[in-house]
Amino acid sequence: MKTFSAKPAEVNKKWVIIDAKGLVVGRLATLVAMRLRGKHLPTYTPHVDCGDNVIVINAAQVVLTGRKRDNKMYYNHTGFIGGIKERSAKSILEGRFPERVLEKAIERMIPRGPLGRIQMGNLRVYAGAEHPHEAQNPEVVDIASLNRKNTRAA
């Protein structure tokens, strides 16, 4: 028996939609990253983009456990000397682009390379419940029912 190796032309990509309301960020991010890479499939091939197209809605209503909402810091650098900036997860979630907390969590679980950038392109994250992908007929994936630890009261 030969080891199966998927060809890019043989891959059938599905569209899935996940409602992030009340879900724990890290637990949601691991499951989304696994779907984006295609590791949930028996036909997974490391060098081929065989994952699904994932739509995440209500990303502004994700939950961080413990004191991470106040204490977790996100850093960026302006490019100038001494130009490191930090923002708390709370300020980002209450700010203009609250979906970035979830995007960064998922991005950091995907390999950093050409294939990883393609796989991140298959992710669409929306802060609210509205999304423009109804024409793709996405399949609903209920993350909350997989494990009781996946949800947390806000």
UniProtKB/Swiss-Prot annotation:
Membrane-crossing segments per the record: none
Gene Ontology biological process terms, A to Z: negative regulation of translation; translation
Keywords: Ribonucleoprotein, Ribosomal protein
Taxonomic superkingdom: Bacteria
Cellular component GO terms held in the UniProt record: cytosolic large ribosomal subunit
GO molecular function, one term: structural constituent of ribosome
Assembly: Part of the 50S ribosomal subunit.
Function: This protein is one of the early assembly proteins of the 50S ribosomal subunit, although it is not seen to bind rRNA by itself. It is important during the early stages of 50S assembly.
Protein family per UniProt: Belongs to the universal ribosomal protein uL13 family.
Protein's name according to its UniProt entry: Large ribosomal subunit protein uL13
Species this protein is from: Afipia carboxidovorans (strain ATCC 49405 / DSM 1227 / KCTC 32145 / OM5) (Oligotropha carboxidovorans)
Designated gene of the protein: rplM
